[in-house]
Amino acid sequence: MSRKPLIAGNWKMNLNHYEAIALVQKIAFSLPDKYYDRVDVAVIPPFTDLRSVQTLVDGDKLRLTYGAQDLSPHDSGAYTGDVSGAFLAKLGCSYVVVGHSERRTYHNEDDALVAAKAATALKHGLTPIVCIGEHLDVREAGNHVAHNIEQLRGSLAGLLAEQIGSVVTAYEPVWAIGTGRVASAADAQEVCAAIRKELASLASPRIADTVRVLYGGSVNAKNVGDIVAQDDVDGGLVGGASLDGEHFATLAAIAAGGPLP
């Protein structure tokens, strides 16, 4: 089936709420409404920017969507520093990233916690973008496919088949994040196809055919066309390139099939 591409811009820990407003305005100005019929576009700002982004998106009736970079596995309570999925839903978030390699690396998040966060996101009507990916040593040893499938199983553990159908998955080879190194389109397809095959096993072929599988890792306007042209790659989780509104809009337009805005 034909899956609508998703281009999600992960701002990471960049931009205050004033800068967030300016960036969303730039994206909205640079990417006319007609493109949104062929590509879904989302921004993933820091928590502190979400209310400002919500106000702008709602006030100007933008077709851009937005989400958060993480959430708590808990709904409420004495969890200092955590942010509840209920709060994110109230802010109008559509997506939430879980299991990003930077969370796994710097905060020691494991697959069990990622699965708990994914379940909590779904409980609150949010679409989790579940991230998996290998380090360079795993890739060089030729174990990257097996590694990603094991990580996928752990990160979706406990979800029902229909819940899996409401998830977005993102393959982000750790060695390609912020390094300028990019997996080739064929490399991305290899792992994303394996992900879809495993989703068919975990849920069903029908459900697997509907799940969007993204690629993340130094995605930009120069390489996104080749990446999304692959049969099993349905968009990109974009890092640094999402901080330039005009570049991000161009990238989204290419993913939509063009022409450039």
From Swiss-Prot:
Disulfide bonds: none annotated. Pathway: Carbohydrate biosynthesis; gluconeogenesis; Carbohydrate degradation; glycolysis; D-glyceraldehyde 3-phosphate from glycerone phosphate: step 1/1. Involved in the gluconeogenesis. Catalyzes stereospecifically the conversion of dihydroxyacetone phosphate (DHAP) to D-glyceraldehyde-3-phosphate (G3P). Substrate binds at residues 10-12, 178, 218, 239-240. GO terms for biological process: gluconeogenesis; glyceraldehyde-3-phosphate biosynthetic process; glycerol catabolic process; glycolytic process. The keyword Cytoplasm applies. GO terms for molecular function: triose-phosphate isomerase activity. It is found in: Cytoplasm. Homodimer. It comes from Mycobacterium bovis (strain BCG / Pasteur 1173P2). PROSITE patterns: TIM_1, TIM_2. Pfam families: TIM. This is Triosephosphate isomerase. GO terms for cellular component: cytosol. Keywords: Cytoplasm, Gluconeogenesis, Glycolysis, Isomerase. Belongs to the triosephosphate isomerase family. The active site is at 100 (electrophile), 172 (proton acceptor). It catalyses: D-glyceraldehyde 3-phosphate = dihydroxyacetone phosphate. Its EC number is 5.3.1.1. InterPro entries: Aldolase_TIM (IPR013785), TIM_sf (IPR035990), TrioseP_Isoase_bac/euk (IPR022896), Triosephosphate_isomerase (IPR000652), Triosephosphate_isomerase_AS (IPR020861).
